[in-house]
UniProtKB/Swiss-Prot annotation:
It holds the Pfam family IF-2B. It is an enzyme of class 5 (isomerase). The record marks 165 as: Transition state stabilizer. This is Methylthioribose-1-phosphate isomerase. The gene is mtnA. It catalyses: 5-(methylsulfanyl)-alpha-D-ribose 1-phosphate = 5-(methylsulfanyl)-D-ribulose 1-phosphate. Keywords: Amino-acid biosynthesis, Isomerase, Methionine biosynthesis. HAMAP family: Salvage_MtnA. Substrate binds at residues 58-60, 101, 204, 255-256.
Length: 354
């Protein structure tokens, strides 16, 4: 069995996008990377919600962690005898946090966990709430490291991999999901080539993923999103490895826009397709991808690059930021609970219940 014991975490796991100071939440501003490394300081839950919506912090696990700390900040001004009474006062703040990004299930999952913590808490509810947020972050980091080893174990030595969007330390508590598998695969000398799609329109691949890999000393080749099929045709890629914002009960997976077309191209070219996400991303109450709300962002995001407009005035734009990849196009879903090969409703139910 592949293990994480031979991974140098001092080298491969040092970026942290979320920092709790005890008084405020510091978020690495991912809109300004890679050329400006700057933190946004949030002093209340509404500032956290605004930062999530504005993509200051992004990536499904990181969004959930930030929201949990947002609840802790909201609790600062609440006076209540126990957690149940505090929850009544905190509910509006929780609703605003929940509305900040609708597609990522980790956000609702983290808030539900904070609600459960409050419901059972006594007079020490504030301390328990802070401990719960810290536990969510620590558990995510441990899960990522375990998933990295599990996913890397599927990859044959000498393989090339292609990833999409950013699924690394910047999107999680640390190490990453899909990028964690790539880090583990590089550390174990299984991966010989890494390619990253630019990921329009926010360019998470170009701005964030290749920057993260550079920090680790991992050589990565950036490609235009539209070059992916041609790259697969050359035989340079054996695995496409992506993260997820929501995984349905039948294995259908919502992820960054462009993931679905990668899965189609991968199947056509005989390239394996891996989804890597913590079990908190699995939503067994959502039967299939048709039930997922797909976030639509400002069409203006498509009108230019880096603040410079490149599109004529009066042009309409359609800007969904997620799509759904059918489970039948996925070869493996990797969570900290294990690997689900060729996901179906049956083997998803066997792994996660429901």
């Amino acid at each position: 069995m592949n293990t994480a014991s031979d991974i140098d975490y001092a080298r491969y796991d040092h970026i942290r996008p979320i920092l709790w100071t005890g008084e405020a939440l510091q978020l690495l501003d991912q809109r300004k990377l890679p050329f400006v490394v700057e933190h946004v300081v949030c002093h209340d839950s509404d500032e956290v919600a605004a930062s999530i919506h504005a993509l200051t912090v992004r990536g499904a696990p990181a969004i959930g962690i930030a929201a949990a700390w947002g609840v802790v900040l909201a609790a600062r001004d609440v006076q209540a005898a126990d957690g149940a009474h505090a929850l009544q006062q905190l509910e509006p703040a929780l609703q605003r946090l929940n509305a900040s990004r609708p597609t990522a299930v980790n956000l609702a999952w983290a808030l539900a966990r904070m609600r459960r913590c409050l419901s059972a808490a006594g007079a020490d509810w504030k301390a328990l709430l802070e401990a719960e947020a810290q536990a969510i972050a620590e558990e995510d980091l441990a899960a990522n490291r375990h998933m990295g080893a599990l996913g890397a174990g599927l990859i044959e030595a000498g393989s090339g991999v292609l990833t999409h969007c950013n699924t690394g330390s910047l999107a999680t508590a640390g190490f990453g999901t899909a990028l964690g598998v790539i880090r583990a695969g590089m550390a174990q000398h299984r991966i010989a080539r890494v390619f990253a799609g630019e990921t329009r329109p926010w360019l998470q691949g170009a701005r964030l993923t290749v920057w993260e890999l550079q920090q680790d000393g991992i050589d990565a080749t950036l490609i235009a999103d539209s070059a992916a099929s041609h790259l697969m045709k050359t035989g340079a890629v054996q695995w496409v490895i992506v993260g997820a914002d929501r995984i349905c009960a039948n294995g259908d997976t919502a992820n960054k826009i462009g993931t679905y077309q990668l899965a189609i191209a991968a199947r056509h070219h005989g390239v394996k397709f891996m989804v890597v996400a913590p079990s908190s991303t699995v939503d067994m109450e959502t039967v299939d991808g048709s039930q997922i709300e797909i976030e639509q962002r400002d069409p203006g995001e498509l009108y230019g690059v880096g603040g410079t407009r490149t599109v004529a005035e009066g042009i309409a734009a359609w800007n969904p930021v997620f799509d759904v990849t059918p489970g039948e196009l996925i070869d493996a879903i990797v969570t900290e609970r294990g690997v689900i090969l060729n996901p179906t409703a049956g083997n998803m139910r066997a792994a996660f219940g429901g």
